[in-house]
Amino acid sequence: MTEPTLNFHIQTHQNQFKIPHELIKKNFKLIQKLIEKQRKQLIDDISKIKKCKTTSPSFKLELIQKLIKNFESFMKKLQNFINKDEEFRSRLIARLENLTELQQYVITNNDNQEGQNHEESTENNNNNRNNNNNSTTTDDDKLLDFHNPNLINWYRDQTNLLIVDYLIKSNTRTRFEDNGEDNPGNIGLLLLKNLTKTNPKLLKLIDYDLLENFNKVFVSIINNHDLSLIVGWFNENKNLLNKINSNLEFEINYCKFLTLIEKGDINEAINYSRENLSGYGNKENYQQTNNNNNNTFSNGDTTSTNHLTNLERLKGLGGLLVFRSMENNNKNNNDLNSNDTPLSSKLMLNSTPFKEYQKLLSNERWESLAQCFIENFTKLYGISKNFPIYIYLSAGLSSLKTKSCYHNVENTIFKHSTGNGIDYDNGNDDYDDDDDDDDEGGVIDSNLSFISAETTTNTNTTSNSGKSLLNDPKYRGPNHYYKLLNKINNCPICSPELFKLSQNLPYAQLITSIFNNPFKLPNGNIYPFDKLLAPTDKYLSEKNTLLRANKVKDPLTREIFTIDSCIRVFPA
């Protein structure tokens, strides 16, 4: 059964319920803490009022008024938490109703009977087999009616949500410069805002606020090298992160320490290391976190791994401090003497250890912090680290990918306009499956650069301003994009948009064929081998003559080929 069924959609949409569920749990714990804190504060304030027997009534009145104000502030905070809880629960209800809507698009028994009556002309054995399969599907799982226009609209909404999810997470823009209005800086939120004008229920089907916060923290780390947002997120979720033996706190302190060294604050970096990094060299500090967890075995492995990894990274910091202090001293001496750099300094700066320690100040530390943040974020909310749209695309591309992909000579999308091919089909590992917009854009741009100057001139691919039309989003569709490239592509696997994603996917499991023992002729046509060998009455003598010469004739083109040149194409 290859058609998506009702149970299939229920299973694939389970992750939509995880984030609201975790947010409800987190919000409930905050309510408990708030109530407990207010209870203790209220008891203390009342006891103080009772003990103040000698004080004037006016002073007692001030204490009571202060108590009332504190309680009113508590009620406002509590109401905010209650509103959040209602919002999270409404998201769960909306997503449940969204899945329940599929029940309306299920194929009914009447539809099955009509389909069975329509297939009465087939063989009896096949009829019995189909009837058994239909009854099993109706009892255990239910097929969806893809001819229902409402179901198509439902799929369109789900596709829009996948695109919004991808754009929110991968957004790198912080502000729109088109106008002065307060438009959302996240391009995914802008798309969601436009979609909700016609379908307001989409707001309940995606956790846009949480994903936006995730994107802000990620962009602040990778692009801005700012630790303020990640520190705030860590403090907000510190208790939950300790339960999963998170290494995020070390990554934050590690980046902060290297930032101080990079600025030249050696003394401040040493003091910061003593207060915030020295404890990670002692394994006992990790054991304290492990004892508070239930899963002792798995958490113990994680603790041991974190300790060994952090210890190795801490060992390199001492050497970095020595070399950076020597470098600063040499700079100070050179400024005082205003002479050329001494030979010892040149040897030190060009030495291999110094270059190795200098690598610690590269962007790798920010990438490591960002990766640790992604792992902790996805683990807290029980979601996948991959984009959901990539998962769906991978499933669809795997069903289309064959061994002829990247080898079709008629597909010129990856060839120069001069006819020189490009080797993308020899297990090239240069294209990694990274979830990054810049990489995806790099694939498209690399294909755009294949256009020669002559082709660009002939096809008028540049505007009056000198900007290439190929960079214009409106020309990225199938009607303009490949035409401007002057190339042909009829395969989604080989397209530049999906080539990178589909490269490492498995081939489709082609275990059936409409032909019996199909063979491919040199001209590309495929026929059952029995049809090529079995002569008809009209061409009986001609085929017999060809077979004696070990040759066959194409029934359509009338071309003659040797049998040895035919290739068996099944199984793939």
Curated annotation (Swiss-Prot):
Location of this chain's protein in the cell: Cytoplasm; Nucleus
Annotated Gene Ontology cellular component terms: cytoplasm; GID complex; nucleus
Gene Ontology molecular functions: ubiquitin protein ligase activity; zinc ion binding
Record-level GO BP terms: negative regulation of gluconeogenesis; proteasome-mediated ubiquitin-dependent protein catabolic process
Annotated Pfam families: CTLH (PF10607)
Record's compositionally biased regions (Low complexity): 124-134
ZnF (RING-Gid-type) ranges: 491-557
Main location as per UniProt: cytoplasm
Domain CTLH as annotated: residue spans: 210-268
UniProt keyword annotations, A-Z: Cytoplasm, Metal-binding, Nucleus, Zinc, Zinc-finger
Stretch list, region Disordered: 110-142
Functional description taken from the UniProt entry: Involved in the proteasome-dependent degradation of fructose-1,6-bisphosphatase.
Family: Belongs to the FYV10 family.
PANTHER family in UniProt: E3 UBIQUITIN-PROTEIN TRANSFERASE MAEA, MACROPHAGE ERYTHROBLAST ATTACHER-RELATED
Annotated protein name in UniProt: Protein FYV10
